[in-house]
Regions:
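Cyclic nucleotide-binding regulatory domains
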Residues: 9, 15-77
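A short hydrophobic beta-strand segment most commonly corresponding to one strand
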Residues: 78-87
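Alpha-helix boundary/capping detector
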Residues: 30, 39, 61, 82, ...
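Residues that scaffold the ATP/ADP-binding catalytic core of kinase and kinase-like folds
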Residues: 4, 40, 58-59, 83, ...
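A short glycine-rich, His/Asp/Glu-containing loop-to-beta-strand
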Residues: 1-10
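Flexible interhelical turns and helix-capping residues at alpha-helix boundaries
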Residues: 12, 43, 92-96
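A small-molecule sensor/coupling module
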Residues: 1, 68-69, 86-120
Length: 120
């Protein structure tokens, strides 16, 4: 998140605001500074809540079609850092620790989602 903060642009969202929509071309990733965001996919049947300190939306920067595969909506007032693809690639090249922190964040979220599906 530190590398994102030094290269990103801060944007605010109110509760209910759509941050991005499934099917859109994604040109940036996000780091959540304050608030909470709901990610949903599969026609809203799947969802995850993102909290301050987490990153989301990076997948669109690394897939060939740069497409969003879900919706992101603010649950509460949010402050979000946005980093475009060019700055993202620069951060990964200049700071391998940035890439490791990003992978750790994604890994943690995948583990939490996996645990949720076991309980269902």
């Amino acid at each position: 998140m530190r590398a994102l903060a030094s290269k990103g642009e801060v944007k605010t969202f109110a509760p209910g605001d759509l941050i991005f929509k499934s099917g859109e071309t994604g040109d940036c990733m996000f780091g959540l500074l304050e608030g909470s965001v709901e990610l949903s996919w599969n026609d809203e049947s799947g969802h995850e809540v993102i909290r301050a300190g987490d990153v989301f939306g990076a997948g669109a920067l690394v897939t060939p079609e740069h497409r969003r595969y879900g919706n992101a909506r603010a649950i509460s007032d949010c402050r979000v850092l946005m980093m475009n693809r060019e700055k993202f690639l620069f951060a990964v090249q200049e700071s391998p620790m940035f890439a490791i922190e990003l992978l750790a964040s994604i890994d943690q979220r995948l583990r939490e989602l996996k645990d949720c599906t076991k309980l269902s």
